[in-house]
């Protein structure tokens, strides 16, 4: 098995240049209630989830990502297997596991930081739609996609395992009428976490393209919008308890 390398220990030859290109903000958050896991545990659903969330269509690439996702859920699958072989090999796990959960690693449960960036872009779009940012007059959402990054790939929640399971009741309509559904979601109860925003500096004038005041408003919106699954049900809301400009 390949040895794990902690990304924080990797030193790049351009690290000094990167430090000059971005302002960093460390954001400490406290969830006010539950944050819900949104990763399906049944292997045959993982591929569809990845297709919808990541836009992956190539079967070889999809099989690789499905395998890694299952590994993140603690499911061993054959190396270099096809997508069908991975699903077949994981059928027993699929029968034992239901609903949605969090990815996990040696530091416990986490959400991917791409969710945070997506939330920031959504907040920028809501707050500043119609404006034009930068010398090229980009729409704010597109500008944020190019100017803003989140350090690392994971935001850990301080839990080795989820705190419990929530059953969500729903109603779906079909050719035979409406029917009730029950879907289970693993959750973490009031965890605290932190992430770091990298916001680009305009090389023309040395100023931030997104100002500190704008970041305060964006994060204030994100508090109510939330992170994780079932945000439409007000899950995943939090308070920012620390906001530090690191440069």
Question: Which residues does each PLM region occupy?
Answer:
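RNA-interacting cores
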Residues: 1-247
């Amino acid at each position: 098995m390949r040895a794990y390398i902690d990304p924080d220990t990797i030193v790049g030859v351009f690290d000094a240049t990167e430090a000059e290109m971005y302002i960093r903000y460390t954001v400490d958050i406290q969830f006010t209630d539950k944050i819900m896991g949104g990763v399906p545990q049944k292997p045959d659903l993982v591929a569809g989830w990845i297709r919808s969330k990541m836009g992956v269509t190539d079967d070889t690439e999809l099989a690789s990502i499905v395998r890694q996702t299952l590994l993140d859920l603690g499911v061993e699958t054959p190396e270099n297997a096809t997508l069908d072989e991975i699903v077949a090999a994981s059928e027993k796990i699929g029968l034992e596991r239901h609903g949605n959960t969090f990815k996990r690693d040696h530091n416990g449960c986490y959400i991917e930081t791409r969710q945070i960036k997506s939330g920031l872009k959504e907040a920028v779009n809501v707050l500043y739609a119609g404006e034009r940012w930068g010398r090229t007059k980009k729409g704010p959402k597109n500008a944020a996609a190019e100017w803003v990054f989140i350090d690392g790939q994971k935001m850990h929640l301080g839990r080795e395992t989820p705190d419990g399971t929530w059953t969500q009741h729903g109603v779906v309509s079909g050719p035979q009428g409406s029917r009730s559904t029950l879907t289970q979601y693993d959750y973490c109860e009031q965890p605290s976490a932190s992430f770091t925003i990298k916001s680009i500096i305009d090389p023309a004038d040395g100023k931030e393209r997104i100002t500190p005041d704008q970041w305060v408003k964006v994060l204030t919106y994100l508090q109510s919008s939330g992170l994780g699954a079932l945000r439409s049900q007000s899950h995943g809301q939090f308070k920012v308890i620390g906001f530090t400009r690191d440069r």
